[in-house]
């Protein structure tokens, strides 16, 4: 019986074959996406909702374990799906030539597309598109981003690469993990249903920011000194003042009532009297502070406008 298994080991379907020392595909590879590329992918994906959009990623293959994505650009296409026909070679060549003139000499390292609202995985059409990219470069990466499920502080994004079908037929282990970099992401049930770890595998995504990129991100929603002198509409400002004063009146009544009740309470009751309840004193102080600040700024801005633009 052992002899029969050894004889059939080298044939597909009859055994796993003799163990060899041939190197397997290593999944210690990481994709480093720049902040600019991530923002452009999310902006492009949100602009195309509810349609799928796609584009190409520019970067470099630093070594066997590092893929760096520096920039992306959108590809023109129409329809609900992303297919191979959506890659326009003429547009791609012209775009790369123009990017080289602006100091972007990087090569195409893969492509990205959006799945608005239904998670990160590769469909049959996406797998065919990825096959065409891997025919040009074996290390091409397919990035999927979900602009609907992405929120501030958590981007729903994943990177994939196809598994060689010949390895699966021969019964070989398609890949191995030999690194402790990054962390494992639990795959979603949708991705497992659509062939994750059977037809394609996930690659760890990391974000490496330099000092200039950190400054750029910090300045995205930074307020300037001019915004403090912006005049509000007078009717809206009066309505806001009126509503805040009404709230302050209710809070003052509640605070007066709470002070009267404190005289009749024991020290044990005083310690827990505000647990799970609104503290009228603290909220009253906050309302007074906000109301005074807004009115002072409004009056100051109105005076400056009168003096400067009279």
UniProtKB/Swiss-Prot annotation:
<dbReference type="InterPro" id="IPR056263">
    <property type="entry name" value="RPN11_C"/>
</dbReference>
<keyword id="KW-0227">DNA damage</keyword>
<keyword id="KW-0833">Ubl conjugation pathway</keyword>
<dbReference type="GO" id="GO:0043161">
    <property type="term" value="P:proteasome-mediated ubiquitin-dependent protein catabolic process"/>
</dbReference>
<keyword id="KW-0597">Phosphoprotein</keyword>
<feature type="modified residue" description="Phosphoserine">
    <location>
        <position position="150"/>
    </location>
</feature>
<dbReference type="GO" id="GO:0061578">
    <property type="term" value="F:K63-linked deubiquitinase activity"/>
</dbReference>
<dbReference type="GO" id="GO:1904813">
    <property type="term" value="C:ficolin-1-rich granule lumen"/>
</dbReference>
<feature type="modified residue" description="Phosphoserine">
    <location>
        <position position="224"/>
    </location>
</feature>
<dbReference type="GO" id="GO:0005829">
    <property type="term" value="C:cytosol"/>
</dbReference>
<dbReference type="GO" id="GO:0008541">
    <property type="term" value="C:proteasome regulatory particle, lid subcomplex"/>
</dbReference>
<dbReference type="GO" id="GO:0000502">
    <property type="term" value="C:proteasome complex"/>
</dbReference>
<dbReference type="GO" id="GO:0070536">
    <property type="term" value="P:protein K63-linked deubiquitination"/>
</dbReference>
<dbReference type="GO" id="GO:0005634">
    <property type="term" value="C:nucleus"/>
</dbReference>
<protein>
    <recommendedName>
        <fullName>26S proteasome non-ATPase regulatory subunit 14</fullName>
        <ecNumber>3.4.19.-</ecNumber>
    </recommendedName>
</protein>
<dbReference type="GO" id="GO:0008237">
    <property type="term" value="F:metallopeptidase activity"/>
</dbReference>
<feature type="binding site">
    <location>
        <position position="126"/>
    </location>
    <ligand>
        <name>Zn(2+)</name>
    </ligand>
</feature>
<comment type="function">
    <text>Component of the 26S proteasome, a multiprotein complex involved in the ATP-dependent degradation of ubiquitinated proteins. This complex plays a key role in the maintenance of protein homeostasis by removing misfolded or damaged proteins, which could impair cellular functions, and by removing proteins whose functions are no longer required. Therefore, the proteasome participates in numerous cellular processes, including cell cycle progression, apoptosis, or DNA damage repair.</text>
</comment>
<keyword id="KW-0647">Proteasome</keyword>
<dbReference type="Pfam" id="PF23594">
    <property type="entry name" value="RPN11_C"/>
</dbReference>
<keyword id="KW-0479">Metal-binding</keyword>
<dbReference type="InterPro" id="IPR050242">
    <property type="entry name" value="JAMM_MPN+_peptidase_M67A"/>
</dbReference>
<keyword id="KW-0482">Metalloprotease</keyword>
<dbReference type="GO" id="GO:0070628">
    <property type="term" value="F:proteasome binding"/>
</dbReference>
<keyword id="KW-0645">Protease</keyword>
<comment type="subunit">
    <text>Component of the 19S proteasome regulatory particle complex. The 26S proteasome consists of a 20S core particle (CP) and two 19S regulatory subunits (RP). The regulatory particle is made of a lid composed of 9 subunits including PSMD4, a base containing 6 ATPases and few additional components. Within the complex, PSMD4 interacts with subunit PSMD7 through their respective MPN domain. Interacts with TXNL1.</text>
</comment>
<dbReference type="GO" id="GO:0061133">
    <property type="term" value="F:endopeptidase activator activity"/>
</dbReference>
<feature type="short sequence motif" description="JAMM motif">
    <location>
        <begin position="113"/>
        <end position="126"/>
    </location>
</feature>
<dbReference type="GO" id="GO:0061136">
    <property type="term" value="P:regulation of proteasomal protein catabolic process"/>
</dbReference>
<dbReference type="GO" id="GO:0016579">
    <property type="term" value="P:protein deubiquitination"/>
</dbReference>
<keyword id="KW-0378">Hydrolase</keyword>
<dbReference type="Pfam" id="PF01398">
    <property type="entry name" value="JAB"/>
</dbReference>
<dbReference type="GO" id="GO:0045471">
    <property type="term" value="P:response to ethanol"/>
</dbReference>
<comment type="similarity">
    <text>Belongs to the peptidase M67A family. PSMD14 subfamily.</text>
</comment>
<dbReference type="GO" id="GO:0046872">
    <property type="term" value="F:metal ion binding"/>
</dbReference>
<dbReference type="GO" id="GO:0006303">
    <property type="term" value="P:double-strand break repair via nonhomologous end joining"/>
</dbReference>
<dbReference type="GO" id="GO:0140492">
    <property type="term" value="F:metal-dependent deubiquitinase activity"/>
</dbReference>
<dbReference type="InterPro" id="IPR000555">
    <property type="entry name" value="JAMM/MPN+_dom"/>
</dbReference>
<dbReference type="GO" id="GO:0006511">
    <property type="term" value="P:ubiquitin-dependent protein catabolic process"/>
</dbReference>
<feature type="binding site">
    <location>
        <position position="113"/>
    </location>
    <ligand>
        <name>Zn(2+)</name>
    </ligand>
</feature>
<dbReference type="InterPro" id="IPR037518">
    <property type="entry name" value="MPN"/>
</dbReference>
<dbReference type="GO" id="GO:0005654">
    <property type="term" value="C:nucleoplasm"/>
</dbReference>
């Amino acid at each position: 019986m052992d002899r029969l298994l050894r004889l059939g080991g080298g044939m597909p379907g009859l055994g796993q074959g003799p163990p060899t020392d041939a190197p397997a595909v290593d999944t210690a590879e990481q994709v480093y996406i720049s902040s600019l590329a991530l923002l452009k992918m999310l902006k492009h994906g949100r602009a195309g909702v509810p349609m799928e959009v796609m584009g190409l990623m520019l970067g470099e293959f630093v070594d066997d374990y590092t893929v760096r994505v520096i920039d992306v650009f959108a590809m023109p296409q129409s329809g609900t799906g992303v297919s191979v026909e959506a890659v326009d070679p003429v547009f791609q060549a012209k775009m790369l030539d123009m990017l080289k003139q602006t100091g972007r000499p990087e090569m195409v390292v893969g492509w990205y597309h959006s799945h608005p609202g239904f998670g990160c995985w590769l469909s049959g059409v996406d797998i065919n598109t990825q096959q065409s990219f891997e025919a040009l470069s074996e290390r091409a990466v397919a990035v999927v981003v979900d602009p609907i499920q992405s929120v501030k502080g958590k981007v729903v994004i994943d990177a994939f690469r196809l598994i060689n079908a010949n390895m699966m037929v021969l019964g070989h282990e398609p890949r191995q993990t030999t690194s402790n970099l990054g962390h494992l992401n639990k795959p979603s049930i949708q991705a497992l249903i659509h062939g994750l770890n059977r037809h394609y595998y996930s690659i760890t995504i990391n974000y490496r920011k330099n000092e200039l990129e950190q400054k750029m991100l910090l300045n995205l929603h930074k307020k300037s000194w001019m915004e403090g002198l912006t005049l509000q509409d007078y009717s809206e400002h009066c309505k806001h003042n009126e509503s805040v004063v009404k709230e302050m009146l209710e809070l003052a009544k509640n605070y007066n009532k709470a002070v009267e009740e404190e005289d009749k309470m024991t020290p044990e009751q005083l310690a827990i009297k505000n647990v799970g309840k609104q503290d009228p004193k603290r909220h009253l102080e906050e309302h007074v502070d906000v109301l005074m600040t807004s009115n002072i700024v409004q009056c100051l801005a109105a005076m400056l406008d009168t003096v400067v633009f009279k």
